[in-house]
């Protein structure tokens, strides 16, 4: 039983490491694409405008107003490429 637990621990560690590497890679890719598209600057401006317009400086209140607009502003090409990368990762680790 100890042998099995050891193998399970190694398998879990490898799976977790793979996920974390993927998570870092996808996050970096997404950040770069959003930066290249000008999305980050647009969302910063949108947030500033909302803070000036709103009586609230509460993060959650501002986020609730800005987030739907920000999500709609993501370039279709960026959205498609990131979703494809996620699908490829899932296909590699999940057997159907």
Swiss-Prot record:
What's in the GO CC field?
Answer: DUBm complex; nuclear pore; nucleoplasm; P-body; SAGA complex; transcription export complex 2
Q: Where in the cell is it found?
A: Nucleus, Nucleoplasm; Cytoplasm, P-body
Identify the keywords attached in UniProt to this record, alphabetized.
Activator, Chromatin regulator, Cytoplasm, mRNA transport, Nucleus, Protein transport, Transcription, Transcription regulation, Translocation, Transport
Is the Cytoplasm keyword given for this protein?
Answer: yes
InterPro entries from the entry? Answer: TF_ENY2, TF_EnY2_sf
MF-aspect GO terms:
transcription coactivator activity
Q: Transcription among the record's keywords?
A: yes
**GO BP term (any one):** mRNA export from nucleus
Q: What does the UniProt record say this protein does?
A: Involved in mRNA export coupled transcription activation by association with both the TREX-2 and the SAGA complexes. At the promoters, SAGA is required for recruitment of the basal transcription machinery. It influences RNA polymerase II transcriptional activity through different activities such as TBP interaction and promoter selectivity, interaction with transcription activators, and chromatin modification through histone acetylation and deubiquitination.
The UniProt entry's sequence similarity note says: Belongs to the ENY2 family.
Oligomer and partners:
Component of the nuclear pore complex (NPC)-associated TREX-2 complex (transcription and export complex 2), composed of at least SUS1, SAC3, THP1, SEM1, and CDC31. TREX-2 contains 2 SUS1 chains. The TREX-2 complex interacts with the nucleoporin NUP1. Component of the 1.8 MDa SAGA transcription coactivator-HAT complex. SAGA is built of 5 distinct domains with specialized functions. Within the SAGA complex, SUS1, SGF11, SGF73 and UBP8 form an additional subcomplex of SAGA called the DUB module (deubiquitination module). Interacts directly with THP1, SAC3, SGF11, and with the RNA polymerase II.
Q: What is this protein called?
A: Transcription and mRNA export factor SUS1
Native source species: Kluyveromyces lactis (strain ATCC 8585 / CBS 2359 / DSM 70799 / NBRC 1267 / NRRL Y-1140 / WM37) (Yeast)
